[in-house]
C-alpha cells in the first residue's frame, strides 16, 4: 500500500538482521511481483547470512528474478566469521538492462581504487573455491547456542522470543510493562546488573521495536 512511482528500491535482508527470520521462495516471489509493477524499482538483496540458514528454505533473490533488477550483497564477515578482513562484494543481476546508469555510477566509484587488501581478497577467493563442509560444524554450533538461549529466555517472566530461522540474532519482546516502557533503560540495567550486553529494539524501529 505504500508503493508508488517514487520508490526506487526494496531491501531484503535474508536471513534477517535483527529478527533471524528467513524468507523462502514464496515470499521472495511476492516481493518480486511488487517490484515488477514499478519499472523504476529494483531490489537490494543483503544475503550475507546465506550460509546460516537453519530452515533450508533461503533462496537467492537473483536466482528467482527473470526481469526485476537485483543487486546482491555478500561478504566474509558473517558466514566466514572474518569481520576484520573487511571484504564484501556486490553482484548485479539486470536481465533487461534497466539499471545501466546505476551500474555505470558504481563502476565510476570503483575507479577510486579503495578496496580491501590484495592478500585478503585472494584468501576469500580460496574460501569460495575450496571445500566448505567445515561451515556445517559452525552452523550446528550456532543452532545449539540458539536453542539454549530460547530455552533460557522462555523461562524468564516478562520476556518472549520466537525461534530464529537463520543468522545469529533473535529479537526478544519485553512483555513486562515496566521493562517495555523504556527498553534503553532495560538494556543499561541488564548491562550494569548482570553484565550482559544487548541492543535495544527501539533502535531498529521506535514504534515496532519495543
Regions from the language model: what does each represent?
Residues 1-5, 108, 158, 198, ...:
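Short, intrinsically disordered, charge-balanced linker/junction segments flanking boundaries
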Residues 1-6, 18-43, 47-85, 95-98:
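Active-site pre-lysine segment of PLP-dependent enzymes
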Residues 10, 17, 46, 70, ...:
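Generic structural signal for small/hydrophobic residues in well-ordered secondary structure
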Residues 52, 163-172, 189-210:
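Conserved PLP cofactor-binding pocket of PLP-dependent enzymes
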Residues 66-143, 150-152:
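Conserved core segment of the aminotransferase class I/II
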Residues 121, 125, 140-150, 161-175, ...:
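Conserved glycine-rich beta-strand-loop-beta hairpin in the small C-terminal domain of fold type I
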Residues 186:
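Short active-site alpha-helical segment characteristic of glycosyltransferases
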